[in-house]
Swiss-Prot record:
Residues 225-250 are annotated as: Disordered. It comes from Rhizorhabdus wittichii (strain DSM 6014 / CCUG 31198 / JCM 15750 / NBRC 105917 / EY 4224 / RW1). GO terms for biological process: translation. CDD domains: RPS2. HAMAP family: Ribosomal_uS2_B. The gene is rpsB. This is Small ribosomal subunit protein uS2.
Length: 250
């Protein structure tokens, strides 16, 4: 099943071509810039379109062959779209705070996930015998785990691909992925370095509408990959995940 594509017009409509002020640029992004206007760098969307298509194809193929995608975006305007896209496509996410060692120290993280699940089970069952204070303490611990680990609770191991919004903010996550040889797909604004990004997608990483467009595209790529995998195995596709309403995806 073919991966989705994102049109030039959809990127323009979302403001994906607007970079940062020219004095805030990272010179390593020069090859991806069209020029500047009124002191703002303009990203070359003629490169973004094929690079996005390449990244979406990677994600679709990865999921089709049983791989896992980790969505990472902890900045305010990315938190909701990241979580929604990952949930809708049956993938995994970190949208609150990247914990050091989240991938490179997976054994410790997996033990924390076990504790998190045990707390959920305990609190959803009979809490008879516990004081109100004890229940409150356990609830607070559970909620803290939910924020940091809720999106990866069912990942079951390190991911096969990482998708990142804002490579500057998620520098630690990218470093861990690089250490483990996990390919990174990242939206790169004019103020970031493309170093360590195997699948760069030059585009604005601040505009809420643009972020939602990218997340929906990646979710759709993962969904189509999963459908393709089921199809290859001869499984029923009747329960396929609902496609996004964004008409920019083809």
């Amino acid at each position: 099943m073919a991966a989705p594509t994102v049109s030039m017009q959809a990127l323009l409509d979302a403001g994906a071509h607007f970079g940062h002020q020219t004095h805030r640029w990272n010179p390593k992004m020069k090859p991806y810039l069209f020029g500047d206007r009124n002191g703002i760098h303009i990203i070359d969307l003629s490169q973004t379109v094929p690079l996005m298509a390449r990244a979406l194809d990677l994600i679709s193929q990865t999921v089709q062959h049983g791989g896992k995608v980790l969505f990472v975006g902890t900045k305010r305007q990315a938190q909701e779209p990241i979580a929604e896209a990952a949930r809708r496509s049956g993938q995994h996410y970190v949208n609150h705070r990247w914990l050091g060692g989240m991938l490179t120290n997976w054994k410790t993280i997996s033990n924390s996930i076990k504790r998190f699940k045990a707390l959920e089970e305990q609190l959803s069952g009979d809490t008879h015998g516990l004081t109100k204070k004890e229940v409150l303490q356990l609830t607070r611990e559970r909620d803290k785990f939910e924020l940091s680990l809720g999106g990866i609770r069912d990942m079951g191991g390190i991911p096969d691909v990482m998708f990142v919004i804002d490579a500057n903010k998620e520098e630690l996550a990218i470093k861990e992925a690089n250490t483990l040889g996990i390919p990174v797909v990242a939206i790169l604004d004019s103020n970031v370095s493309p170093d360590g990004i195997a699948f760069p997608v030059p585009a604005n990483d601040d505009a809420a509408r643009a972020i939602r467009l990218y997340c929906e595209a990646v979710a759709e790529a993962a969904t189509r990959g999963a459908q393709g995998g089921r199809q290859a195995r001869g499984e029923d596709l009747g329960a396929a995940v609902e496609a996004p309403s964004e008409d920019a995806l083809a």
